[in-house]
């Protein structure tokens, strides 16, 4: 991975020698995720990020960044969270089913859809049947899958938080 990125800047043998002698130290995040994961999305190459929570999209964007292995700092100061919409007084179950895809993008997109429905006063259900089981190998990023349980827990927590705060803003 690194050899592709440094072409023309430093001869590869010289770069390898400098790393071996500990004269330079590449980013451990970049080394850990080098290859298809980092080529697909460079978010995995960052140690940390920051965002204000001033839009409902902040939640799924933070989730995606975290799923890439990057830390997320956030601000919930009044000038930011006051921009979030009010939660409806009544949240009613609807027949809508959110189909969750088995990817970081799929999980974040499903959270965005859930929060969108909740802000419209709707409580949909979700189908996590496409998510690989806990312990399955992750082909691109490496490691093992958590299975759908953590996402189901997050969705239930989110619905409960919206119900608890119905008729007002999240704060």
Where are these regions (language model features)?
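Extended catalytic cores of very large enzyme megasubunits
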Residues: 1-171
């Amino acid at each position: 991975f690194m050899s592709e990125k440094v072409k023309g800047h430093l001869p590869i043998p010289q770069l390898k020698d400098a790393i071996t002698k500990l004269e330079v130290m590449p980013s451990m995040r970049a080394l850990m995720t080098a290859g298809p994961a980092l080529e697909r999305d460079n978010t995995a190459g960052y140690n940390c990020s920051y965002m204000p929570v001033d839009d409902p999209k902040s939640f799924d964007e933070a989730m995606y960044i975290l799923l890439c292995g990057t830390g997320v700092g956030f601000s919930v100061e009044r000038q930011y969270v006051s921009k979030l919409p009010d939660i409806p007084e009544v949240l009613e179950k609807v027949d809508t089913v959110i189909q969750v895809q088995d990817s970081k993008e799929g999980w974040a997109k499903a959270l965005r859809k859930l929060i969108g429905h909740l802000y419209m006063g709707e409580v949909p259900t979700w189908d996590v049947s496409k998510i690989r089981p806990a312990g399955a190998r992750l082909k691109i990023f490496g490691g093992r899958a958590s299975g759908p349980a953590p996402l189901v827990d997050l969705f239930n927590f989110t619905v409960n938080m919206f119900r608890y705060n119905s008729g007002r803003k999240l704060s």
